[in-house]
């Protein structure tokens, strides 16, 4: 079993839009369409940071994602989520202090639970809170800056690297109209140490 000290945590905050595909059947909630079940496509953009002993504010980078999913019931949904762009790492010891850049892409299969309908009395609310959890794979590349300092970071990789990704998060989603919603999502991701070429102690 992997110990906590060997796990890297990364967090992301993203603002996005979703485009649901819904049926045209009238419902008791006063809508002229049936909100569930439905499929959706989502796009997001935001910022992320990696939690190590280095200053997290200096490691903030842009992130973007696209997702394809469905809600099977008013409570339970799932999505295939693709996320990536840029990332930064930082190394600091008694004599060295520097940052390095690399790129990444992550794919996750996420379970989505609608807490608003789970604990509410209706099957539809214009404002919903989702709990998200998932697993997937992370791909990192263009790690030349870190590899150039391999004498200081023995875990630095030359070409590319695959890692597990485990995610937990929450989303606030506002249904603006029949086929458009606006959302704000925050999530935390667990990856292996080699993702950023070092252990958490550096």
What are these regions (language model features)?
Residues 25-38, 75, 117-129, 176-179:
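Short loop/turn motifs that connect adjacent beta-strands in outer-membrane beta-barrel proteins
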Residues 76-149, 161:
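Gram-negative (and chloroplast) outer-membrane scaffold detector with strong preference
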Residues 89-93, 102-104, 177-202:
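Predominantly the C-terminal beta-signal and adjacent terminal strand-loop region
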Residues 37, 58-64, 101-107, 127, ...:
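Residues that define the transmembrane beta-barrel architecture of outer-membrane proteins
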Residues 1-33:
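Cleavable N-terminal export/targeting peptides
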Residues 53-60, 89-98, 141-153, 194-201:
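Outer-membrane beta-barrel translocator domains and adjoining extracellular loop/strand segments
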Residues 23-69, 142:
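Short glycine/proline- and aromatic-enriched beta-strand/turn motifs that initiate or cap beta-hairpins
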Residues 43, 47, 66-70, 109-115, ...:
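Residues on the lipid-exposed face of transmembrane beta-strands in outer-membrane beta-barrel proteins
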């Amino acid at each position: 079993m992997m110990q906590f000290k060997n796990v890297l945590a990364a967090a992301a905050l993203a603002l996005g839009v979703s485009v649901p595909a819904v049926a045209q059947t009238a419902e008791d909630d006063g809508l002229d369409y049936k909100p569930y079940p439905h499929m959706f496509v989502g796009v997001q953009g935001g910022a992320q940071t990696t939690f190590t002993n280095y200053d997290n504010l200096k490691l903030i980078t842009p992130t973007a994602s696209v997702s394809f999913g469905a809600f099977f019931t008013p409570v339970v949904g799932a999505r295939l989520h693709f996320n990536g762009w840029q990332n930064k790492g930082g190394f600091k010891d008694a004599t060295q202090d520097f940052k390095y850049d690399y790129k990444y892409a992550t794919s996750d299969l996420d379970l989505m639970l609608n807490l608003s309908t789970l604990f509410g009395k209706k099957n539809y609310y214009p404002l919903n809170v989702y709990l998200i959890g998932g697993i997937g794979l992370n791909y990192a590349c263009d790690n030349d800056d870190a590899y150039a300092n391999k004498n200081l970071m023995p875990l630095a990789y030359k070409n590319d690297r695959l890692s597990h990704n485990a995610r937990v998060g929450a989303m606030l989603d506002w249904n603006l109209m029949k086929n458009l919603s606006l959302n704000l999502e925050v999530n935390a991701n667990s990856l292996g140490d080699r993702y950023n070429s070092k252990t958490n102690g550096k």
